[in-house]
Amino acid sequence: MHLDERKILLALDGSEFSETAIDTTAALARRLDAELHLVRVTSPLLSTAPELFPNLGQEFTNQAQDGARDYLQSLAGRFAGVSLQLHTPLGNPKEVISQVAMEQACRLVVMASHGRTGVARWLLGSTAEFVLRHVESAVLLLRPQAMPSPQGDFHHVLVPVDGSATSREVLAKVGPYLADGAKVSVLRATGLTARDYTLLNNPQEVTSYVQHLKEQLGHLDAHGLKVEPQVIDGEAADSIVHFAEQNGCDLIAMSTHGRTGFRRFILGSTTEKVARQAACPVLAFPTHPVA
């Protein structure tokens, strides 16, 4: 599937929580010169007495859709300078958001999501996780407590790698989302495979691996990005989240699968765990077409 690099989808549910993603998404759309698709899903409403009021359910549904469109139109002023398309489809939010993203071939889907604490209306494990697994777009999960700059760019991104080509592809894709001169921490968390144990227990091999990464990532330095490879010991998800917090990262960028090549998360469930636990925004890139 060919994605349109000039289309972004923002999912809203009418809550103040979901609206925390508006300003960042608008800034991203301006920076990327992208058309923005606002989606507010409504559920079909059924009459409690269809035998007496056969058309009442449809009337309620029509009113709900009209209300959803009015809601999206009321937000238009916050997207000055951005081309908008409004969508008020019926159905299950997780399925409909994914469907609209694929029909419109959006490069990016943006959603507000809690990290670490609280329970979002769109809980990872339901809507956000479903979207992560089923769209070919990149998915940006924003945290209300840790929004990027007003320009919608990021200044210190953490990119975990596992030695697979798919995880390294993230480095080629994350550039447009970064500020000029941004810092890129490339992290290899060991302790996952026999190869990782060998790497960890051989300081010379660690040094060699870091040097190899620096050589591979030299092109990023040429684009004004400050690249710092790191190798640390620990379980992947915990190490990633801890490193991001300790080093002030304002974005974690990952692929949705790594070594296995299956349509799952990198190294089993690492991306899912990071998306649940990280305090900063998480940007997930699929690396192969959906099966």
Task: For the regions a language model picked out, list residue spans one by one.
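Gly/Ser-rich helix-loop-strand patches that form or flank binding pockets
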Residues: 4, 31, 95-147, 242-291
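Short, hinge-like loop/turn segments at secondary-structure boundaries
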Residues: 54-57, 103, 127-128, 157-159, ...
